[in-house]
């Protein structure tokens, strides 16, 4: 995939970049793997705003992705590489030998016609899914489970990857994309390779309207709000925040204040915290 640049024909186009979508082979998704996606606009079941900066955007359909990769021993062949509006990574449609079709995250380097399999006996090549105990030390992986059989939860964004560092008893040491080293049960599955579409982070949105197409609403500074809306609000003109440290909209210290629970159950599985910690 390459980055496409635009000529500065307007202020919005100046500096804008996008993907050239060279890897995408079709714009027609598999209908049997689509599900309706009801947009909530950041509201809960009482209609109250619980997640800011969400709302609007283009209508989407959800693509049902196989994060479990539990179709053991049955080879599949990649039929298409597709764009997914619900995630940064591309997805691949796999046709299995028994006739079933499933979407998987498209790893870097996968192409139409590539054969993928799952299970303890699968080869160590991009797109194959195995239990961590069967993956050699030093292998790059993605789509990692935290509980056996639950489906991949870690390392799913475009361009991300993790690395198997070692094996200790029933756990496997994995270095995540953030630099954190974590112990994960050896029965959990992971997919070989790096997630594709690695140029995604280099894309320049270019204008506010493009964020609105994606369902992202504006972020407003607290200092321009009223006192009842934000701790930084109020005052005459451009007033300072009037506090010894910046605050979140809910009155909690921010910008460097640690928010992780002191007694988090997952602490015992973290061997080394992420790089900036």
From Swiss-Prot:
One of its GO terms (cellular component) is large ribosomal subunit. It holds the Pfam family Ribosomal_L2_C. The keyword Electron transport does not apply. Belongs to the universal ribosomal protein uL2 family. This is Large ribosomal subunit protein uL2. Residues 38-58, 219-277 are annotated as: Disordered. GO terms for molecular function: rRNA binding; structural constituent of ribosome; transferase activity.
């Amino acid at each position: 995939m390459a980055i496409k640049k635009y000529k500065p024909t307007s202020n919005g186009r100046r500096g804008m970049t996008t993907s050239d979508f060279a890897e995408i082979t079709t714009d027609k998704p598999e209908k049997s793997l689509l599900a309706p996606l009801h947009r909530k606009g950041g509201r809960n079941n009482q209609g109250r705003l619980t997640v800011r900066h969400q709302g609007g955007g283009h209508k989407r359909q959800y693509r049902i992705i196989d994060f479990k990769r539990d179709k053991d021993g049955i080879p599949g062949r990649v039929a298409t590489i597709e764009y997914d509006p619900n995630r940064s990574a591309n997805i691949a449609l796999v046709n299995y030998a028994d006739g079933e079709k499933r979407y998987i995250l498209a790893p870097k380097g996968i192409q139409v016609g590539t054969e993928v399999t799952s299970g303890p006996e699968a080869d160590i090549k991009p797109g194959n899914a195995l239990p961590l105990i069967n993956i050699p030390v030093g292998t790059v992986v993605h789509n990692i489970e935290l509980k056996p059989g639950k489906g991949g939860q870690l390392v799913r964004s475009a361009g991300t990857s993790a690395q198997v560092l070692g094996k200790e008893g029933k756990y496997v040491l994995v270095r995540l994309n953030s630099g954190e080293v974590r112990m994960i049960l050896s029965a959990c599955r992971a997919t070989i390779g790096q997630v594709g579409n690695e140029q995604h982070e280099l894309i320049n949105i270019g204008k506010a309207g493009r964020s609105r197409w994606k369902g992202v609403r504006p972020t407003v500074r607290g200092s321009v709000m009223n006192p009842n809306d934000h701790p930084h609000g109020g005052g005459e003109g451009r007033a300072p925040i009037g506090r010894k440290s910046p605050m979140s909209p809910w009155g909690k210290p921010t910008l460097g204040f640690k928010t992780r629970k002191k007694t988090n159950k997952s602490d015992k599985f973290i061997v080394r915290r992420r790089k900036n910690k």
